[in-house]
């Protein structure tokens, strides 16, 4: 299977969805984002979300460079948390850089699980055609 990549069109559509928000929605989103702790230690949103079987499978399918970048962000955040420090403000994750990088992989895994479930519950119609 060819690796999915977080393509330029996906990033552009995510950023344009931020721009289409009303002024009040943008202010609320920025308030929540700026008061969150994860961006102050350099994490992305998908780095700290709770793991489920779908997320674990999506993480397993990540390309090596994305896995290594994620591992680095988590290790750095753990060290910062343990020492009760945050990154300098210039190094904080911005809302434009907080791309949902796992979303394409999660969508593929959900579709595959749905297809597998449909095939597992398939009943041959010839049995009932008497």
From Swiss-Prot:
Domain of life, per lineage: Eukaryota
Gene3D superfamilies in alphabetical order: Cytochrome b-c1 complex subunit 7 (1.10.1090.10)
Principal localisation: mitochondrion
Disulfide bond sites: none
Assembly mode: Component of the ubiquinol-cytochrome c oxidoreductase (cytochrome b-c1 complex, complex III, CIII), a multisubunit enzyme composed of 3 respiratory subunits cytochrome b, cytochrome c1 and Rieske protein, 2 core protein subunits, and additional low-molecular weight protein subunits. The complex exists as an obligatory dimer and forms supercomplexes (SCs) in the inner mitochondrial membrane with cytochrome c oxidase (complex IV, CIV).
Full protein name: Cytochrome b-c1 complex subunit 7
Cited function: Component of the ubiquinol-cytochrome c oxidoreductase, a multisubunit transmembrane complex that is part of the mitochondrial electron transport chain which drives oxidative phosphorylation.
Keyword tags: Electron transport, Membrane, Mitochondrion, Mitochondrion inner membrane, Respiratory chain, Transport
SUPFAM superfamilies: 14 kDa protein of cytochrome bc1 complex (Ubiquinol-cytochrome c reductase)
Record's subcellular location: Mitochondrion inner membrane
Annotated GO biological process: mitochondrial electron transport, ubiquinol to cytochrome c
Membrane topology: Peripheral membrane protein
Annotated family: Belongs to the UQCRB/QCR7 family.
GO CC list: mitochondrial inner membrane; respiratory chain complex III
């Amino acid at each position: 299977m060819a690796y999915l990549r977080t393509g330029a069109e996906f990033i552009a559509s995510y950023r344009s969805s931020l721009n289409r928000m009303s002024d009040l929605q943008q202010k609320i989103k920025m308030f929540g984002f700026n008061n969150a702790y994860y961006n102050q230690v350099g994490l992305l949103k998908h780095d700290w979300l709770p793991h489920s079987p779908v997320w674990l499978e999506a993480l397993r399918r990540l390309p090596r460079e994305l896995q290594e970048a994620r591992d680095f962000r988590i290790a750095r955040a753990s060290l910062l948390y343990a020492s009760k420090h945050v990154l300098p403000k210039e190094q904080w994750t911005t809302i434009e850089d907080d791309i949902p990088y796992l979303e394409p992989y999660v969508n593929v895994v959900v579709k595959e699980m749905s297809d597998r479930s449909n095939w597992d519950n398939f009943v041959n119609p010839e049995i009932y055609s008497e």
